[in-house]
């Protein structure tokens, strides 16, 4: 599974997932399913944010080409992928600037158009079950929940799916592709079932060539969302109100 993840996902997503697991004291060599799940969740969050802006009229628009002269504001603030300290700094800054209620748990995104935090979920189970689990944990009407599955299903708070159909279809297609790639290599069952995961781990320890023939079909292009986060948590210059909350990192 580890080899699959490293070949299937953008290197920067893999690096962020490694840092996240290290921060929580988890071993990606052992918890390979969690490694894959974190990478998948990160990618969905970035895809959710990519290309979405707010123009001068306050309207949400989709722009796929970078135009440095365009007076556009990123619609979504990315919180997922940052270390906990910086993530809470961003959340606090958003709350102070917008008057939004501070969430009890770290959300994944903030939507400047709808003025709400968003919790993104990616599940291997039934979407409604995972949605209820998220809702019971968060217990806040101010955090919008949007759940995606690997089968193309989705569920969102009050059936408000936030994004346009094409943007959501892009996410669903990517998730379905990941599932198919896992299934082709005998990894899907272990990804879904803990019992199968233990069996798969034993196989992985015996053979490190499980994904040797994996074709690298995924684009290595760094998404706009990922560029904002590189090389670390640099000032993205997205809004003047949040600018002071981001730490400057020395150039490498």
Swiss-Prot record:
GO terms for biological process: viral RNA genome replication; viral translational frameshifting. The record marks 195, 198-199 as: Important for efficient shutoff activity and nuclear localization. Keywords: Decay of host mRNAs by virus, Eukaryotic host gene expression shutoff by virus, Host cytoplasm, Host gene expression shutoff by virus, Host mRNA suppression by virus, Host nucleus, Host-virus interaction. It is found in: Host cytoplasm; Host nucleus. The active site is at residues 80, 108. The keyword NADP does not apply. The record marks 28, 65, 202-203, 206 as: Important for efficient shutoff activity. It comes from the Viruses. The keyword Lipid metabolism does not apply. Transmembrane segments: none annotated. One of its GO terms (molecular function) is RNA binding. Belongs to the influenza viruses PA-X family. This is Protein PA-X. It comes from Influenza A virus (strain A/Beijing/39/1975 H3N2).
